[in-house]
Amino acid sequence: MASVARSSALLKQVAAQQSVAANGLRVAAFHTTSRKSLLPPPPQRIEGTVNDPVEVPPPSPSHGSYHWTFDRVVAAGLIPLTVAPFAAGSLNPTMDAVLAATILIHSHTGFGNIIVDYVPSKRVPKARKVFTWGLNAATVLVGLALYEFETTDVGLTETIKRVWKA
C-alpha cells in the first residue's frame, strides 16, 4: 500500500515539475527584455573615508512627521468641505473659496512630495530646481484661475452641481 501511494505521489511531483519548467521558460522569456534606465548612473565618488560618520541633516519642522501630519490634516479636511455644500443645499461663496484653496494646497503639497521623492537634488539638482519652480508657477496660475472663476463666474460647487445634473 505504501509503495502505491509513494509512486502516485512521485508521479504528481514529476508532473508538477514539468509544468513549472514549461511555464518557467515562458515567464523567463517574458522577463528577459532589455531594461532602459531613465537617468544615467550616478558618478562613483566617495566623500571622506570609510571610518567617517554619515552627516545627519539638521532637523527642520517642514520635513518629517510635521510635514506628513499637515498633509493628512489637509486631506482629511477636504472630506467635509467637499460634502457640506451639497448636503446642506446652500452655496456659500466663503465655503466655496475655502474648498478651492484647500484643493489647491492639497495639490501643491502632493506634487511637491512627488518631486522630492522622484527627482533627487543630489543627482539632478538643475532638474529638481526646474520642477520646483514649475510647480510653484503652476500653483500660482491655478490659484489666479480659481480666484477669477470664483469671483466672476458661478463658482466651484455650482459648477460641480451643474455638471453632475447634466
Curated annotation (Swiss-Prot):
UniProt KW keywords: Electron transport, Heme, Iron, Membrane, Metal-binding, Mitochondrion, Mitochondrion inner membrane, Transit peptide, Transmembrane, Transmembrane helix, Transport, Tricarboxylic acid cycle
Predominant cellular place of this UniProt entry's protein: mitochondrion
InterPro entries recorded for this chain? CybS, SQR/QFR_C/D
Q: Please give an example of a GO cellular component term from this record.
A: mitochondrial inner membrane
Cellular location(s): Mitochondrion inner membrane
Identify the domain of life.
Eukaryota
Its pathway is: Carbohydrate metabolism; tricarboxylic acid cycle
Q: Which residues cross the membrane?
A: 66-87, 95-115, 125-149
Instruction: Indicate which residues the UniProt annotation says bind a ubiquinone.
Output: Y118
- Ranges facing Mitochondrial intermembrane side: 88-94, 150-166
Is Transmembrane included in the keywords of this UniProt record?
yes
Membrane-topology annotation of the record? Multi-pass membrane protein
Which positions does UniProt annotate for heme binding? H106
Mitochondrial matrix topological domain residue ranges: 1-65, 116-124
Biological process GO annotation list? mitochondrial electron transport, succinate to ubiquinone; tricarboxylic acid cycle
Molecular function, one GO term: metal ion binding
Which Pfam families does the UniProt entry name for this protein?
A: CybS
Q: What does this protein do?
A: Membrane-anchoring subunit of succinate dehydrogenase (SDH) that is involved in complex II of the mitochondrial electron transport chain and is responsible for transferring electrons from succinate to ubiquinone (coenzyme Q).
Q: Which family does it belong to?
A: Belongs to the CybS family.
Its assembly, as annotated, is:
Forms part of complex II containing four subunits: a flavoprotein (FP), an iron-sulfur protein (IP) and a cytochrome b composed of a large and a small subunit.
- Per its record, how is this protein called by name? Succinate dehydrogenase [ubiquinone] cytochrome b small subunit, mitochondrial
Q: Could you tell me which species this protein originates from?
A: Neurospora crassa (strain ATCC 24698 / 74-OR23-1A / CBS 708.71 / DSM 1257 / FGSC 987)
